[in-house]
Each structure stands twice: as C-alpha cells, then as structure tokens.
C-alpha cells in the first residue's frame, strides 16, 4: 500500500504514485511486479480508522504472504479491473496502467513513477453531498515522511483565479 499519490490531470482522469525499490536489495516490490503483470491497479483513500492496518501491510513480505491477512484489511472485488479494492475504503479508484517510468540507477533507493488512467471511481454515498466529498466524513490521512502522517482536520480555503482579469 502507498499512503501517498498525486493527481496528474482530469482529461482523462490520471493518477500517479512512486514505488521505490526495496531498501535492502534494490529489487522491485510486489506492487510494481503485479502492476507490470496485470496492467491494472486500485488506489484506495486511507481514512484514519484503518491507518494502522494500512501501515501494517506495507512491510516487504515475501510474495507468497497475503498482506490482506496480515493487516486484517478486507478485499472486495473490483468492477472493471482484476486487483481487489478495500472494503474499508470510502473512496477507491480503479485504474489501467498508462506507463511506468524508471528513476535512478536500479539500486536500492531508486524507484519508479507509475501513471494510470482512472476508469472507475467508487465513492461511498454517506460521504458525498451536492457533488462534493465531505472531508469530515471521509477523515483521510496522508503520509508526510518517514513514520509521520497528517489528518485533514485543520484546513482553510484560498480562492484562486482560473484566468487573469481582463
């Protein structure tokens, strides 16, 4: 699992994340290997209610270990892609692989940028009102760095202009 990702553009809806190579031997992690094989992936928004479980399945287990079982998270079938999504997630994006870009020299510490097109959005009805996600109900967390995460409960709005005044 990855606690960080970024939107790229909206036409088509595109998203990216950056898996690193394993720290002790530089090999590609299972997430990347699975994406290479299936050409598909799912991104789930992590709410604080299952943040600890998300971190628990980030351990680099051998590929024969099921992180769903070790973390006690629950997979559910996706609608359009093979990889499952999380039943705990109130927002999930089913994605088709667009491209993988390798960054660095292929050793530990280097990594990849994975770019995918979102082909299906899942948004729980309980957190969606008038065309907007209610952040207080989603209660998302984000990774800052290392073992540090943040909550989205102290935010403010800054209105930006789409184009300059005439």
Please place each PLM-identified region on the residue numbering:
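Basic, polyanion-binding surface patches
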Residues: 1-166
